C-alpha cells in the first residue's frame, strides 16, 4: 500500500454520506457551527450557489447573498465538521457552471428562475 492509497482511505472515512444533491443556481441554507466564547451554536447562512467544486473531500460550494445592500460570498467545504446541515430551499434553472456574472448584477437582476423538475 503506497502513500496515495493510504491518504485516499483516510479521506474516504471522513466523507459525509448524507449530503443532498446540490447544483449551481440552487438556493440553500447552510447550518454552520460557530463558537462564541465557550458556547457553540448553529448559524444559518442562506444564499444562492454560484460555484461548485467537486474534488473528493475538498469539495466546496460558493454561496452568495445580499446582506444590508452588500454582496457577501462564503465558500463552504461540504465535508467539513463545521458544516452541520445543508438544506435546499429551491432549485434554480441556469445554463452556466459558474454564476460569477451575478456579482455585477443588482436588485431584481440577480434572481434565478425556479426549476420544478428536480426534487428538493
Curated annotation (Swiss-Prot):
Transmembrane segments: none annotated. One of its GO terms (cellular component) is cytosolic large ribosomal subunit. The keyword Ribosomal protein applies. Pfam families: Ribosomal_L19. Signal peptide: none annotated. The keyword Calcium does not apply. GO terms for molecular function: structural constituent of ribosome. Disulfide bonds: none annotated. GO terms for biological process: translation. Keywords: Ribonucleoprotein, Ribosomal protein. InterPro entries: Ribosomal_bL19 (IPR001857), Ribosomal_bL19_CS (IPR018257), Ribosomal_bL19_sf (IPR038657), Translation_prot_SH3-like_sf (IPR008991). This protein is located at the 30S-50S ribosomal subunit interface and may play a role in the structure and function of the aminoacyl-tRNA binding site. Belongs to the bacterial ribosomal protein bL19 family. This is Large ribosomal subunit protein bL19. The lineage of its organism: Bacteria, Bacillati, Cyanobacteriota, Cyanophyceae, Gomontiellales. The gene is rplS.
Amino acid at each position: 500500500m503506497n502513500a496515495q492509497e493510504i491518504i485516499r482511505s483516510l479521506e474516504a472515512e471522513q466523507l459525509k454520506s448524507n449530503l443532498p444533491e446540490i447544483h449551481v443556481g440552487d438556493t440553500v441554507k447552510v447550518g454552520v457551527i460557530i463558537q462564541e466564547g465557550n458556547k457553540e451554536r448553529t448559524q444559518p447562512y442562506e444564499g444562492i450557489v454560484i460555484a461548485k467544486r467537486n474534488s473528493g473531500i475538498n469539495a466546496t460550494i460558493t454561496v452568495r447573498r445580499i446582506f444590508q445592500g452588500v454582496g457577501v460570498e462564503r465558500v463552504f467545504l461540504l465535508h467539513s465538521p463545521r458544516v452541520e446541515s445543508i438544506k435546499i430551499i429551491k432549485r434554480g434553472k441556469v445554463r452556466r457552471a459558474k454564476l460569477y456574472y451575478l456579482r455585477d448584477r443588482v436588485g431584481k437582476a440577480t434572481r434565478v428562475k425556479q426549476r420544478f423538475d428536480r426534487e428538493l
